[in-house]
């Protein structure tokens, strides 16, 4: 059975709070506290100078927040309308307790990638707030068409098809090939994508050759771009995030609308717990039909928390990266400095004194050894006991004192975004009654992943139920299967079992390419009662198949229904590859 299931008792009723009950997998339950609006005093943000006519509402709104900090059990009301924020500083919510921010549909318009930083708060709710970007000042992304491409001169022209004028100094950060008719991320054939900002010097020169045309000369890495192709060119990728949430408990975001954000929608980390997104929207700004991106990176990124969260009734689309990514980070040992100290490499150091470090081999095998962290100094971790001889370079270290598991993702609509739908990399998850449509890559991915230089994330999964969801035309570019479960260690798979108790049941899958499920490193996997209809599209031999790979055991595949299709004649086949343990 899964471990660390939430089993919270119903909190004692009190005047200042209400409690939302969340029922998860295997009869788990947890509660999220919210301010009781009926018992809260009320103050209007206009008292502090927040005004739709103001050039910059930053200082006035910060004053309102400070008042709420000094006076808990309060509702801060923001009247409907548009409010500009031009100061290049974050709005800090630090130490607030029992505060409701009721925005009544107000929209905050930013022009710098500094938004909300929510730190050390407890029991707060932000309701009805819209956030967008001041597109009159700069753009987050643009549709471009390739013309006059030349391999000989390593150049092409970019026609900004929705703009009348473009500046030669507009940032060129990342290209993603788009469907030229639907204007959605990804193409079935000849998909291309380049994160040019990761390779300084790949763009040699940019010159303006027309009102809305730029000529790009490159180092040859973009020679496969051809005339007529349509791309989304991002001018911004990371660095920002509408809501940064750190070490905060019992926080609710309800009815939030993110229409154009530089960075992620939500970055929730640093041991936050008991949080929820209810009825929130990430999508294209309906007032700007030439804006083709919602958030330039992930919709929701949850890492190194204490979990117990819910995402329900939301609508996420057109992000520059995954809909939702749930995980905890890991680290690798780069050097053993003495009997009790190691140096580590990680993209997100999540350790603190008092934590328990758990060690695995470089192949993810559990070593049966853990130690308490006594100090963290940069990349150095010191422990409360001597390290055995087998703790060596390239061993993996995870933090046993954090767990982003115990979550429910239900009743949402995930669609037409770049990259994946859900990355589910933590324990005890329930993913049910969601709709997935035309995600560029696979709609659900379960992984433990070391990609050195980029990220190190995922501690394995014990307990995940994926049920009663619908998947339509997902995985446009066919990155693996609809449901993908695997490990990656810089391009290689682990040889051990790292995923346990995963169920995929009663889902419907329509008109997709590639396999239905691709699984490795999992024990007790159930794929039952799903419905597959691949009558549309074109012929492909792998469409709808299930493949079971190495380090799998106790796999049950039963009662799945397939509509006959000449486009997917082998969809009932189950493939086995590199199986080393009994099925």
Question: Residue spans of the language-model regions?
Answer:
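Right-handed parallel beta-helix/beta-solenoid
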Residues: 10-59
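N-terminal extracellular ligand-recognition/capping segment immediately after the signal peptide
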Residues: 47-49, 58-65, 72-99, 103-117, ...
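Short, T/G/N/S-enriched strand-turn elements that build extracellular solenoid repeat scaffolds
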Residues: 65-69, 85-95, 246, 264-270, ...
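Short glycine/acidic-rich loop motifs that flank beta-strands on beta-rich extracellular proteins
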Residues: 73-74, 87-90, 110-115, 135-140, ...
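Short "repeat-start/strand-capping" segments in structured domains, especially the N-termini
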Residues: 97, 121-124, 248-252, 270-276, ...
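Ser/Thr/Gly-rich low-complexity blocks that favor extended beta-strand/coil architectures
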Residues: 133-136, 142-144, 158-209, 347-379
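Small/polar beta-strand repeat architecture
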Residues: 188-240, 367-369, 374-407, 415, ...
């Amino acid at each position: 059975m899964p471990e660390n299931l939430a089993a919270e008792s119903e909190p004692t009723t009190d005047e200042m709070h209400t409690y939302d009950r969340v029922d998860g997998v295997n009869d788990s339950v947890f509660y999220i506290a919210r301010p009781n609006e009926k018992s809260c005093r009320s103050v209007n943000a206009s008292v502090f100078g927040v005004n739709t006519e103001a050039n910059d509402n930053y200082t006035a709104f910060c004053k309102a927040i400070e008042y709420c900090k000094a006076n808990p059990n309060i509702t801060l009301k923001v009247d409907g309308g548009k409010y500009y924020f031009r100061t290049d500083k974050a709005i800090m919510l630090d130490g607030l307790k029992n505060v409701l921010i009721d925005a009544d549909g107000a929209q905050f318009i930013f022009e710098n990638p500094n938004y909300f930083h929510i730190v050390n708060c407890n029991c707060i709710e932000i309701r009805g707030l819209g956030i967008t970007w001041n597109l009159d000042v700069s753009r987050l992304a643009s549709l471009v068409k390739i013309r006059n491409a030349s391999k000989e001169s390593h150049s092409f022209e970019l026609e900004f098809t929705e703009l009348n004028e473009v500046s030669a100094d507009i940032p060129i950060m990342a290209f993603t090939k788009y469907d030229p008719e639907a204007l959605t991320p990804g193409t079935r054939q000849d998909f291309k994508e380049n994160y040019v900002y990761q390779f300084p010097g790949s763009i040699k020169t940019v010159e303006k050759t027309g009102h809305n045309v730029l000529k790009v000369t490159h180092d040859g890495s973009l020679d496969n771009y051809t005339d007529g192709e349509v791309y989304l060119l991002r001018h911004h990728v990371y660095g920002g995030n509408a809501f940064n949430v750190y070490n905060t408990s019992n926080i609710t975001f309800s009815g939030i609308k993110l229409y154009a954000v530089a960075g992620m929608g939500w970055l929730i980390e640093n041991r936050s717990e008991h949080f929820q997104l209810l009825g929130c929207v990430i999508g294209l700004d309906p007032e700007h039909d030439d804006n083709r991106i919602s958030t330039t990176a992930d919709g929701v990124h949850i890492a190194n928390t204490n979990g117990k969260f819910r995402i329900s009734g939301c609508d996420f689309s057109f992000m520059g990266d995954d809909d939702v990514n749930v995980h905890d980070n890991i680290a690798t040992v780069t050097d053993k400095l003495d009997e009790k100290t190691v140096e580590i490499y990680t993209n997100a150091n999540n350790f603190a004194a008092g934590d328990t470090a758990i060690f695995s081999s470089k192949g993810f095998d559990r070593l049966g050894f853990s130690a308490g962290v006594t100090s963290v100094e940069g990349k150095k971790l010191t422990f409360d006991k001597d390290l055995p001889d087998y703790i060596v370079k390239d061993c993996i270290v995870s933090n046993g004192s954090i767990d982003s598991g115990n979550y429910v993702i239900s009743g949402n609509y995930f669609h037409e975004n770049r990259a994946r739908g859900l990355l589910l990399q933590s324990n005890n998850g329930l993913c049910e009654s969601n709709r997935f449509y035309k995600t560029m890559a696979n709609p659900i991915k379960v992984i433990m992943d070391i990609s050195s230089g980029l990220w190190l994330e995922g501690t394995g999964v014990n307990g995940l139920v994926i049920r009663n969801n619908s998947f339509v035309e997902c995985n446009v570019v066919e990155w693996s299967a609809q449901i993908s479960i695997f490990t990656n260690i810089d391009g290689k798979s682990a040889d051990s079992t790292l995923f346990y108790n995963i169920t995929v049941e009663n889902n419907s899958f329509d008109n997709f390419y590639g396999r239905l499920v691709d699984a490795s490193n999992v024990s007790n996997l159930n794929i039952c009662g799903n419905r597959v209809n691949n009558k549309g599209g074109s012929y492909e031999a792998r469409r709808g198949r299930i493949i079971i790979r190495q380090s799998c055991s106790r796999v049950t595949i039963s009662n799945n229904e397939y509509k006959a299709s000449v486009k997917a004649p082998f969809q009932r086949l189950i493939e086995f590859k590199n199986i080393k343990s009994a099925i």
